[in-house]
Amino acid sequence: MSYPENVGIKAMEIYVPAQCLDQSLFEIHQGVSAGKYTIGLGLESMNYCTDREDVCSLALNAVSSLLSTYNIDPNSIGRLEVGTESPFDKAKSVKSVLTQLFEPAGNTSLEGIDTVNACYGGTNALFNAVNWVESRSWDGRDAIVVASDIAIYKETASRPTGGAGCVAMLIGPNAPLSLAPNVRGTYMTHAYDFYKPDFSVEYPIVNGHESIRCYISALDGCYKNLQERLQQKHDKSNTSTNGVKPDYETGRVMDLFDYMAFHTPNCKLVSKSYGRLLYNDCLMSTDEAAWQGIPEELLNLQHQESLTNKILEKTVVSLTKEAFQTRVEPSILAPSKCGNMYTASLYCSLLSLLSNIDAKDARGKLIGMFSYGSGIASTLFGIKVTGDISEIVQKVDLMNRLARRYIATPEEYEEACSLRSKAYGRKNYTPTGSVERMAPGTYYLESIDESYCRTYARK
């Protein structure tokens, strides 16, 4: 049986709100030490929404722009799936709202639905779409995957790690960014590090230190499973194919990926995570030279102890600094300006990477992608650059797009948070946030009627 080749991401689009918060101003506003957010977390600014936007309006903007920017026929789409952790309805999906973009063309045969598990939903939707194209159920049409979220916190200390936005991706065969089928490691388990059990509020319950520990532990688990799968593939074929480079013979994951993008709650966590991969490579190695530069007292740490050992953390970050600057730093340039976009975070990081490397030299490179969703669901997987990425880079124009946002004051941000808090769960509600700074053609929430039905307008 023949399968479609190079199934993956054919096109990408991103939508971010028209305004953002300057983190250096927020430091002053909150009375914390200078650099706590900008240096300590690596965050420059943060997207945020007023009561005029919700997860559906963000998605409407990203998908409508994807269709128009790439001149995609709505009837050429056979699957539409949304990853989100910001739904406001326990029954009606975000995807169902997006069907309004396809019905005018007569397309009501869209498979797929919402998928939810914290920040992992977008990745699960991507895997589902790729699997659909590669299956006997495929009808020959492309799929669209949407990752849309709004991150906002009740606790003052957590608010700098908020964000908002949506990434939409066209999925199909002969893609310039194809999923490497044999480069994947998954780790899933049970934890209460971050969750949203209270449907009366928009805010999560967060155990910050535990969530970071879970993130790093999940990366370890994905690393281990990836190594097991690659070893199985190597044992069967004794060759390196399907995106696995010949130099993987070294057994080092650090040698496997040319570039990497991570789910980015904050940018400092990304540098720590990249260093953690080096530590895992050392643990896997039988060569004592692999531990060069790492103090002897760190060689025999128990796993749980290693997750919180600051000396180890600083050591591996230092040892990987040069490689990080080349292979990973391009992926955090946009997230540092956007904040945490939850399900869209990893794919904002991917767009950032593509936008800040030389597109001409990217073909043939393997990008490592680490997706993490609290609770816990996580996967470390590979995307192979199998075509020209320049069209995506040029049409998204990411960094220039971010530069056009209005930089709000902390007071304006706090007012927006207050509006959202008052509006959440309301009926008979008319939003009062301004639409003045929204670009022409932007979808926004117009009203919520007495039956909680939402109406969206377009500027």
Please identify what each model-predicted range represents.
Residues 1-52, 158-244, 376, 381-459:
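Condensing-enzyme catalytic core mediating Claisen C-C bond formation in acyl metabolism
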Residues 212-239, 250-251, 255-257, 261-285, ...:
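A conserved active-site cap/scaffold subdomain adjacent to cofactor or substrate pockets
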Residues 36-40, 44-57, 86-142, 280-345:
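Conserved catalytic cysteine-centered active-site region
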Residues 59-66, 98, 125-132, 222-226, ...:
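Buried hydrophobic packing segments
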Residues 134-169:
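Flexible, glycine-rich active-site loops centered on histidine and acidic residues
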Residues 9, 52-123, 244-245, 250-276:
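Conserved beta-ketoacyl condensing-enzyme motif
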Residues 302-310, 325-405:
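C-terminal catalytic subdomain
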Residues 13-15, 82-89, 116-122, 146-152, ...:
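Acidic, glycine-rich active-site loops and adjacent beta-strand->loop/helix elements
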